[in-house]
Regions:
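N-terminal active-site beta-alpha-beta segment that forms phosphate/nucleotide-binding
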Residues: 12-93, 97-103
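N-terminal glycine-rich FAD/FM-binding segment characteristic of electron-transfer flavoproteins
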Residues: 8
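Conserved phosphate- and dinucleotide-binding cores of soluble alpha/beta proteins
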Residues: 97-215
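Short, Lys/Arg-enriched N-terminal segments with co-localized hydrophobic residues
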Residues: 1-4
């Protein structure tokens, strides 16, 4: 078992470092972390104290421990979970467009550094595309696939059904486990964003992590 893990770590490191170079060629900053702890350390090196931070719904950011570190540090964290009304939640989501740092992940990423994100409300993909000064993404190596076509398939047939189940949403994919290209009223695949380049150099900062994170 230890040998199997060691071989997998070697494979992920070689692949991860190649993906880092691919992301850098797309005008983004990228880093490969072998552990969640290393990922959090790197993220906090990037984010200056006193920064205003917002986020989309991203399990990966919670799972690696970054949110706990930010909440216990000297940052202005806009926490949607503390909103007491739907209106307040919307207000916090809209504040993302003027924040210093927006945190999130991806639904899938190809080995050549293109990533796919699918949203229902679209607050996350909107902020990735425009607004926040910096976008920091935590991406487990479980989300890296060979091609852009594979990335789209992973986003729609793996990530979306799991997220629909996670939120208790009544869609065909939540019942059957894969995408039916539905037009259900509760569809969470309303907006699909393909990110292939950053016009603003270094606006995207991506930490690849040798862990299974998110969905």
């Amino acid at each position: 078992e230890a040998i199997k893990m060691d071989v997998r770590q070697k494979r992920n490191k070689v692949l991860g470092e190649r993906v880092v170079k691919a992301l850098e060629s797309r005008n983004m900053d990228a880093y490969y972390a072998e552990t969640k702890e290393e990922a959090v350390k790197k993220a906090l090196e990037w984010i200056p104290e006193g920064s205003t931070i917002n986020m989309g719904g991203a399990s990966s950011v919670h799972e690696c421990g970054l949110i706990d570190a930010i909440k216990s540090g000297n940052y202005n964290f806009c926490d949607r979970d503390k909103a007491s009304t739907p209106e307040e939640k919307q207000e916090i989501a809209r504040a993302a467009f003027s924040c210093d740092w927006f945190l999130g992940s991806v639904n899938a990423m190809s080995e050549d550094g293109v990533f796919i994100n699918i949203d229902g409300n679209a607050n996350r993909v909107a902020a990735y595309a425009f607004g926040p000064k910096n976008v920091l993404l935590i991406v487990g190596m479980n989300k890296v696939v060979k091609t852009q076509e594979d990335a789209m398939s992973r986003a729609r047939n793996e990530a979306a059904p799991v997220n629909a189940q996670r939120f208790g949403i009544d869609t065909p994919c939540s019942k059957a486990g894969s995408c039916f290209d539905c037009k259900s009223p509760e569809c969470i695949c309303c907006q699909i964003l393909v990110t292939r380049f950053s016009r603003q150099k270094g606006r995207f900062k991506i930490i690849l992590v040798d862990e299974n994170l998110g969905f």
